[in-house]
Curated annotation (Swiss-Prot):
Protein name as annotated: Small ribosomal subunit protein uS13
GO molecular function: rRNA binding; structural constituent of ribosome; tRNA binding
Biological classification of the source: Bacteria, Bacillati, Actinomycetota, Actinomycetes, Mycobacteriales
UniProt-listed HAMAP family: Ribosomal_uS13
Organism: Mycolicibacterium vanbaalenii (strain DSM 7251 / JCM 13017 / BCRC 16820 / KCTC 9966 / NRRL B-24157 / PYR-1) (Mycobacterium vanbaalenii)
Similarity comment: Belongs to the universal ribosomal protein uS13 family.
UniProtKB keywords: Ribonucleoprotein, Ribosomal protein, RNA-binding, rRNA-binding, tRNA-binding
GO cellular component: cytosol; small ribosomal subunit
């Protein structure tokens, strides 16, 4: 099993898919990495040589922000928005959707489970 950036890549998947197991790498970025390193998209992870693994590791470390570094950067961006008091920061602080989605209905993922309000009855 190849290990890149602290993530074990699945052995039997194609490299194009296996690289997406790393936080910060999606399909498009995965294809760019493989093209830059000259590794076939259809190659399976178990067929990689040590040189190819090293080549992938060097490329990712040198050119991309992934895993822990990227997570820290995203958290820092959210903290900064909260501190400066911008609209997005306020939405983060209140636990509401940040990007303009409706909240009269839906938004349950962001708001959490429903809280019943005492004394409020349904109109007939």
């Amino acid at each position: 099993m190849a290990r890149l950036m602290g993530v074990d890549l699945p052995r039997d998947k194609r490299m194009e898919i296996a690289l997406t197991y790393i936080y910060g790498i999606g399909r498009t970025r995965s294809q760019e990495i493989l093209e830059a390193t000259g590794i076939s998209r259809d190659m399976r992870t178990k067929d990689l040589t040590d040189d190819q693994v090293t080549q992938l590791r060097d490329y990712i470390e040198g050119n991309l922000k992934v895993e822990g570094d990227l997570r820290r950067e995203v958290q820092a961006d959210i903290r900064r928005k909260i501190e400066i008091g911008c609209y997005q920061g306020l939405r983060h602080r209140r636990g509401l959707p940040v990007r303009g989605q409706r909240t009269k209905t839906n938004a349950r993922t962001r708001k959490g489970p429903k809280r019943t309000i005492a004394g409020k009855k349904k109109a007939r």
